[in-house]
Amino acid sequence: MARPNKFLLWFCCFAWLCFPISLGSQASGGEAQIAASAELESGAMPWSLLQHIDERDRAGLLPALFKVLSVGRGGSPRLQPDSRALHYMKKLYKTYATKEGIPKSNRSHLYNTVRLFTPCTRHKQAPGDQVTGILPSVELLFNLDRITTVEHLLKSVLLYNINNSVSFSSAVKCVCNLMIKEPKSSSRTLGRAPYSFTFNSQFEFGKKHKWIQIDVTSLLQPLVASNKRSIHMSINFTCMKDQLEHPSAQNGLFNMTLVSPSLILYLNDTSAQAYHSWYSLHYKRRPSQGPDQERSLSAYPVGEEAAEDGRSSHHRHRRGQETVSSELKKPLGPASFNLSEYFRQFLLPQNECELHDFRLSFSQLKWDNWIVAPHRYNPRYCKGDCPRAVGHRYGSPVHTMVQNIIYEKLDSSVPRPSCVPAKYSPLSVLTIEPDGSIAYKEYEDMIATKCTCR
């Protein structure tokens, strides 16, 4: 029995020694497979490289734009929106944001999100009548699943586009009748709400008038607030020319065609990653900042004076000279004093902590098929060495100086202060959603505007 036991022991040892070798060969083969697949998918979006990051760490590592916009990205192709609706949202983007994507400071509205939905289905109920001025009535179904629970509706409008170019010398009075149809499976609570609304509006068309907006906030606000995401409505128009002002009009008749409307929702995104308009005062009131902040090293993303950097660098150089001259007036130390080392510790480092540009195009990431605007993005980043005596020039707290002393005098394992962003500006983004809707959103903390040492 001794020999079989001894043989079994040797066999187990041999298998244990061989196991790492086979495992290593399998691992190397797996790495080769991954490398080959990476070459085949070299055109894939950079987000795919980050899928293995733990969900708890992802929030701290990824900027809000890449984190939020990549949610819900699937393999199915995106539906393309109506060209007229896309043109309208591009004009809206130019009104709200600069070419670089920064929200304009003269804004007065409270919403930070605008969503445009086109109807999923369109059914004509009855033909129009040119004699009576009745336009063809239609039934529309809007799918609002893209609205999240943190988005609160502030305003909603139906946007009509006039199909053919019309020019009227007189005012055109239109009466719109709109009725919401509730599905059979709806709850009783929603059934009690009024679902039939009649809008009496007077529209005046000019030579270049192409759009009609009908405010339906009072109708949709309770529905969206109750998480109703499927809106089925019936709409018809009756339009006539003003006979009193222009009696020569031929019985008030005209030929006008309205394309099926889009639904625009103006929302306030209350999440932390969204830009909130009341914070815009923080960017407007630069003169009211404290003296310490005014002396800090800063850079502004767009539209600021180019001479600001020159003046700040001049002041930094002058303050550095004053510091060195004041230190030279002090009595000299021991004979072993090294003058060059003494100068070096007070002069600013050559690679000073400051802002750097990093301009990228969304076409480089192959995201330009769904990010409509801006075309380019400059997040900027902070890089450089932090001086030993940071003082208040960077807006750094006293703790930064204490950390420097600990690093130099007590424990070198304690890291030195790092060059990091201190302030940011928001970014406006216009995107095409997977369902073909169009979204304008404003994201907080997307562009670094100031560096500090911490």
UniProtKB/Swiss-Prot annotation:
Would you tell me the Gene Ontology cellular component terms? cytoplasm; extracellular space
UniProt xrefs under Pfam families: TGF_beta (PF00019)
Tell me the protein's name: Growth/differentiation factor 9
Any one GO molecular-function label of the UniProt entry? cytokine activity
Give the modified residues of type Phosphoserine: 325
Please state where this protein is localized.
Secreted
What is the native source organism of this protein? Homo sapiens
- Residue ranges for the region (Disordered) are 303-330
Q: Which GO terms describe its biological process?
A: female gamete generation; negative regulation of cell growth; oocyte growth; positive regulation of cell population proliferation; regulation of progesterone secretion; transforming growth factor beta receptor signaling pathway
- What keywords would UniProt list here? Cleavage on pair of basic residues, Cytokine, Disulfide bond, Glycoprotein, Growth factor, Phosphoprotein, Premature ovarian failure, Secreted, Signal
Reported tissue expression: Expressed in ovarian granulosa cells. Present in oocytes of primary follicles (at protein level).
